[in-house]
Amino acid sequence: MASSSNYNTYMQYLNPPPYADHGANQLIPADQLSNQHGITPNYVGDLNLDDQFKGNVCHAFTLEAIIDISAYNERTVKGVPAWLPLGIMSNFEYPLAHTVAALLTGSYTITQFTHNGQKFVRVNRLGTGIPAHPLRMLREGNQAFVQNMVIPRNFSTNQFTYNLTNLVLSVQKLPDDAWRPSKDKLIGNTMHPAVSVHPNLPPIVLPTVKKQAYRQHKNPNNGPLLAISGILHQLRVEKVPEKTSLFRISLPADMFSVKEGMMKKRGEGSPVVYFQAPENFPLNGFNNRQVVLAYANPTLSAV
């Protein structure tokens, strides 16, 4: 499911609504929850629960779903993969063991919804949320995933059924050089420059450009955005070897401020930012990508 060929199959059906316009408050009504029976996920990954006692350890969380779709007098589409990124989290943001337990013991199902005339199916976690949790799906309770699967066009005008046949939780430990916003007071309402790479994925938060760091902390404005926009062509994306759907950006050490972020030096000591993306994500940089301001605190929304 993590392979490029499988993801390309998935992409045939993908035309999701914009990240900013959909997903923030899409909760299943309580009267519908009592009638749903979900499945629990299997687990794959390189999880070491001893890491839960180390505050500077980061993990990437992903759910991979398999969905079968069928309609009257239509050929059944079996095994359509849905790649469902949950986010990247460090131990100082929330205990690792508690997060994994909440994800693995949760019950998941799928629902249909319509947005701008298009029909979608969406994987949901049933139950209540953890208000302060950095992973949006756990924080919001029965929050639907922000990445949705479009119903193939030949099913759009017919009655159809869909079935969630498999769900896998993948937990991947990030290398030691990972940069994350720090746990000190700056994380609260501090805004960082960020790159928006996909309408249904959260922006990639970056350290501040050194010249703009003080101004950004005191009064966020267009300064950090212009500073980042001017150097996007210098940023290069690398696929992390032996990791699924995980990429990194090595930032110029003489250009970015890392004082407010956790970082273990590698090579020249440049900060390294990790993010989740589909396996076929282009590696030719961030030219023409949208630059936004985003909160360092993942429980707050980007603007």
UniProtKB/Swiss-Prot annotation:
GO terms for biological process: symbiont-mediated suppression of host innate immune response; symbiont-mediated suppression of host JAK-STAT cascade via inhibition of JAK1 activity; symbiont-mediated suppression of host type I interferon-mediated signaling pathway; viral budding via host ESCRT complex. Keywords: Host cell membrane, Host endosome, Host membrane, Host-virus interaction, Inhibition of host innate immune response by virus, Inhibition of host interferon signaling pathway by virus, Inhibition of host JAK1 by virus, Interferon antiviral system evasion, Membrane, Viral budding, Viral budding via the host ESCRT complexes, Viral immunoevasion, Viral matrix protein, Viral release from host cell, Virion. GO terms for molecular function: structural constituent of virion. It is a peripheral membrane protein. A motif (PPXY motif) lies at residues 16-19. It comes from the Viruses. GO terms for cellular component: host cell endomembrane system; host cell late endosome membrane; host cell plasma membrane; membrane; virion membrane. It is found in: Virion membrane; Host late endosome membrane; Host cell membrane; Host endomembrane system. InterPro entries: EV_matrix (IPR008986), EV_matrix_protein_N (IPR043079), EV_matrix_sf (IPR038057). It holds the Pfam family Matrix_Filo. Exists as a dimer until it reorganizes at the plasma membrane into multimeric form. Interacts with host TSG101. Interacts (via PPXY motif) with SMURF2 (via WW domains); the interaction positively regulates virus budding. Belongs to the filoviridae matrix protein VP40 family. Plays an essential role virus particle assembly and budding. Promotes virus assembly and budding by interacting with host proteins of the multivesicular body pathway. The interaction with host E3 ubiquitin ligase SMURF2 facilitates virus budding. The interaction with the nucleocapsid and the plasma membrane may also facilitate virus budding. Specific interactions with membrane-associated GP and VP24 during the budding process may also occur. May play a role in genome replication. Most abundant protein in the virion. Late-budding domains (L domains) are short sequence motifs essential for viral particle budding. They recruit proteins of the host ESCRT machinery (Endosomal Sorting Complex Required for Transport) or ESCRT-associated proteins. VP40 contains one L domain: a PPXY motif which potentially interacts with the WW domain 3 of NEDD4 E3 ubiquitin ligase and the three WW domains of SMURF2 E3 ubiquitin ligase. This is Matrix protein VP40. It comes from Lake Victoria marburgvirus (strain Ravn-87) (MARV). The lineage of its organism: Viruses, Riboviria, Orthornavirae, Negarnaviricota, Haploviricotina. The gene is VP40.
